[in-house]
Amino acid sequence: MNHPLRIHEIRLPWKHTPMNPHYAFVREQIVALLNELGLCEEEKEKDRRDGVITMGAYIYPDAGPNELLFGTLFVLWLFFFDDIFDESKFLKGESSQAAERTLQMFRTRQPPVNATTGLSMGIVQLEKLLLRIFKMAKDLAHGPYVISRFMETCEFYITEGAIPMDKFRFRKELPKLDEYLAVRTIDGAGEACIVCSEIVAHLALPEHIINEPRIKRMREITGQQIVYSNDIYSYHREKIHNNSVNALNIRCLTKSFNDALTDQINQVNEWVLEFEALKNSLYESTLWENNLDVYITGMENTMMGCKIWSESCTRYDLNALLHITPDKNEFPER
């Protein structure tokens, strides 16, 4: 039976990435570190932790143990940081304060200068985790240029993605679709994840390659594919948590749910076709070489890893979600 959200129609033209053979070792290391920091003490947080560790093993299938540990910890940090805005256990003032402190950390690469008095322990613990990630990035990155881009893309994610997305949630009306996509793409932290993949692969691509228009567009597509697909996978979960800021909900302002879903899936698949066309264009150009191949493969693995995780994790398990939702009419026609 096909999935009601038609996730089987979201297509990626690459083989499923195999799970990294260092998964078990890295999981053990991460569980110990998070226990040391006092993170992931609740059952739902442990479930999230285990899911993201699995996702990391698919995003970085060829990484060594230390590289996989770094890449997975960064993805975990992104999920934890996003929870500061999403979870009710953090107050509005706390989320703003946490964002400012984290921005300061990315700009200075040091702990925040302000005291932690009055902050939730979860925020303090998250800052300690980020400092561990900084140290690992410095040890693994192939040169200061890559580290600088890593910090800059993370800062960009917060200022132009996470904070504006949080503001959307407090608006009386949903944003326009184009406005939403521009912010949501950055909120997905795709650019930062791609630089993370560079660090994992020990790459140091020159600036003219990083800024080549086709490559810039491929990075953007990677981010767009991930977040628009996620808006499909997470649709029911967001309904349960009364979060209407989702591309499908915005499309449903003018279309039926099924038509909105069709448009969303078609858009995601069109982006992937564009990605492949750009890749083929680069392959036929004088720019193509092994490091660029590895770099692009990192983007493909990021999209595929997110897909594998989204279609298997309990977070988006449709049967479980429908079991707890009070709304039996899951597919309203408008």
Swiss-Prot record:
Q: Which residues bind Mg(2+) 3?
A: N230, S234, E238
Necessary cofactors:
Mg(2+)
Motif D(D/E)XX(D/E) motif is found at: 82-86
Motif interval(s): WxxxxxRY motif: 309-316
Q: Name one GO biological process term.
A: terpene biosynthetic process
Notes on the domains: The 2 conserved active-site motifs D(D/E)XX(D/E) and NSE are required for coordinating the divalent metal ions that stabilize the PPi moiety of the substrate. The C-terminal WxxxxxRY motif is frequently found in terpene synthases and is important to guide product formation.
The identity of this protein, by name, is Terpene synthase 1
